[in-house]
Curated annotation (Swiss-Prot):
This is Testis-expressed protein 13A. Belongs to the TEX13 family. Pfam families: TEX13 (PF15186), TEX13B-like_middle (PF22835), Zn_ribbon_TEX13 (PF20864). A zinc finger (RanBP2-type) spans 376-400. It comes from Homo sapiens (Human). The keyword Oxidoreductase does not apply. Binds to ssRNA containing the consensus sequence 5'-AGGUAA-3'. Plays a role in transcriptional repression. Required for rapid sperm motility and timely degradation of mRNA via its interaction with CNOT1. Interacts with CNOT1; the interaction may inhibit CNOT1 binding to mRNA and subsequently CNOT1-mediated mRNA degradation. GO terms for molecular function: mRNA binding; zinc ion binding. Residues 348-368 have a biased composition (Basic and acidic residues). Residues 347-374 are annotated as: Disordered. Testis specific. Keywords: Metal-binding, RNA-binding, Transcription, Transcription regulation, Zinc, Zinc-finger. Residues 92-408 are annotated as: Required for repression of transcription.
Length: 409
């Protein structure tokens, strides 16, 4: 008996059906043999063998019928086995789906935890950033308080820095002016101690009031101090200072005045300090010894009476253009050796008292040389009195004659 009713893998659930199929296969011995031989094969191969048997004409009909019933039993068995495999696959897919679902839930939980962690970290970072910004603002405020510029501090304190700086910067110039004023007052001869002290104070006061030199790279004084416009009047102070010096030095000898002309370079420091406020600049190059051309009006004529008229005749000239050069000192008689032809005053030649000015004797000795006169570009020598004048002056501060006048021949 090929089919067994107790075999669940046969695919048949009823025993009478199994008995009927076994009876049909038992009509020929080939029926049960065909069933047992092909029980492990696939349905396609079983069908191919059955087709070969049915097409063979030499095979009897009983064999063909028994093989056909065996093929039917194998087909049911293969169908039952395929159903079992399908159920196993479905159960596996259900389990796999559950696994995916649980994995997705776990991933969602992890993602939620990660988002919460990131949000917490973001809030902490934002809090630290705000604290850092607050600390930075406080540090900047402390730095600004510590790094307040001296000018801003002077603004808050009533501008004490200008007077202090002016006193420091002009201290050296003031001392030199005082020494020069004392020497000039001593040369005048007719003044007492009180008058000399008063003259020195008058000379030194405008110098100390001058503005200090401005350092390179410093900000413009107009933007630092509100009272810069008042400093513009320092030019007038300089003019007054020169007039005072001329009055004090009116009776001094030419050597004294020549020495004072050499000290004019010291007065340059004061002029430089004032020229900053008036917007003028002085170059620091060497002075040229070339003649200075001066344009004169075409219709101008001037007749000048020289104090040395006994030595030369003064013609009347009216040139359209003149050249001012350093004049050659006139040749004086031998009996004039004891005199100094100073043109700084209107008194003419004066007798030099060597006992009155002992410290100026070093310039009269032949083996001593006068210190050089320091010049700047544009400074000019007066053709009449040989005094050195600043480039900004149009008239000689000694004799009062203009640069545009032709020197008498």
């Amino acid at each position: 008996m090929a089919l067994r009713p107790e075999d669940p893998s046969s695919g048949f659930r009823h025993s009478n059906v199994v008995a009927f199929i076994n009876e049909k296969m038992a009509r020929h011995t080939k029926g049960p043999e065909f069933y047992l031989e092909n029980i492990s094969l696939s349905w396609e191969k079983v069908e191919d063998k059955l087709r070969a048997i049915l097409e063979d004409s030499e095979v009897p009909s009983e064999v063909k019928e028994a093989c056909t019933w065996g093929s039917l039993a194998l087909g049911v068995r293969f169908a039952h086995r395929q159903a079992q495999l399908q159920r196993h696959r479905v159960r596996w897919l259900h389990g796999f789906a559950k696994l995916h679902k649980s994995a997705a839930q776990a991933l969602a939980s992890d993602l939620k935890k990660l988002r919460e962690q990131q949000e917490t970290e973001r809030k902490e970072a934002a809090s630290r950033l705000r604290m850092a910004q607050t600390s930075l603002v406080e540090v900047q405020k402390e730095r600004d308080k510590e790094l307040v510029s001296p000018h801003e501090w002077e603004q808050g304190a009533g501008w004490p820095g200008l007077a202090t700086a002016g006193g420091v910067c002009t201290e050296g110039a003031a001392e030199e002016e005082e020494e020069a004023a004392v020497a000039a007052a001593g040369a005048a001869g007719g003044k007492g101690a009180e008058e000399e002290q008063r003259d020195v104070e008058v000379v030194a006061a405008p110098v100390e009031a001058m503005a200090p030199p401005v350092e390179a790279g410093a900000a413009p004084m107009e933007t630092q101090f509100p009272h810069v416009e008042a400093r513009a009047a320092s030019m007038e102070t300089t003019e007054k200072l020169e007039r005072i010096l001329l009055q004090l030095l009116g009776d001094a000898d030419q050597e004294k005045y020549t020495y004072w002309g050499q000290k004019e370079g010291d007065l340059r420091s004061v002029e430089t300090a004032t020229s900053y406020f008036s917007g003028t600049t002085n170059p620091w190059s060497r002075a040229s010894s070339e003649p200075l051309p001066v344009q004169l009006p075409a219709s101008y004529s001037y007749s000048y009476s020289s104090p040395f008229s006994s030595f030369s005749d003064i013609p009347t000239i009216s040139p359209p253009q003149a050249t001012v050069t350093a004049p050659v000192p006139p040749q004086l008689p031998s009996d004039w050796e004891a005199f100094d032809t100073s043109l700084w005053s209107d008194g003419g030649p004066h007798r030099i008292d060597h006992q009155e000015h002992p410290r100026d004797r070093r310039y009269s000795e032949p083996h001593q040389q006068r210190p050089p006169v320091y010049r700047r570009p544009g400074d000019w020598d007066c053709p009449w009195c040989n005094a050195v004048n600043f480039s900004r002056r149009d008239t000689c501060f000694d004799c009062g004659k203009g640069i545009w006048l032709q020197k008498p021949h």
